[in-house]
Amino acid sequence: GWPAYPGSNGIRSSVCQKKLGCGSKNLASLGVCKAFCPGRKRFWQKCGKNGSSGKGSRICNPVPAHAVEKAGKGLIKVTDMAVAAIAKYAGKK
């Protein structure tokens, strides 16, 4: 299924960052969010509510779009885990 259009407010980068809890747990996730959220915003601006720009653009394919929505959430989790691991490792030396 096509991911639900977040609404004109929901595509805002700041809303995306807040939703993902960017930088709230650790600052490293902020960088990931700052890369992910504007990209996501551009995607929705380009592809519109139904996920197709009408030009048959590959970027608007619902499959990668759905993956991107899920990956965004997963990305932050992974970043948090990686930073925790690095901090732990650095503390050992």
UniProtKB/Swiss-Prot annotation:
GO biological process, one term: killing of cells of another organism
Localization in the cell: Secreted
GO CC terms: extracellular region
Keyword flag Secreted: yes
GO molecular function: toxin activity
Tissue expression notes: Localized within the skin and proboscis and are most readily isolated from body mucus secretions.
Keyword annotations of the record: Cytolysis, Disulfide bond, Hemolysis, Secreted, Toxin
S-S pairs: C16-C37, C22-C33, C47-C60
Main location: secreted
Function: Cytolysin that shows hemolytic activity (on bovine erythrocytes, HC(50)=5.75 mg/ml). This hemolytic activity is completely inhibited by small unilamelar vesicles composed of PC/PG, PC/PI and PC/PS in 1:1 molar ratios (with at least 100 mg/ml concentration).
Family statement: Belongs to the worm cytolysin family.
Protein name as catalogued: Parbolysin P3
Organism: Parborlasia corrugatus
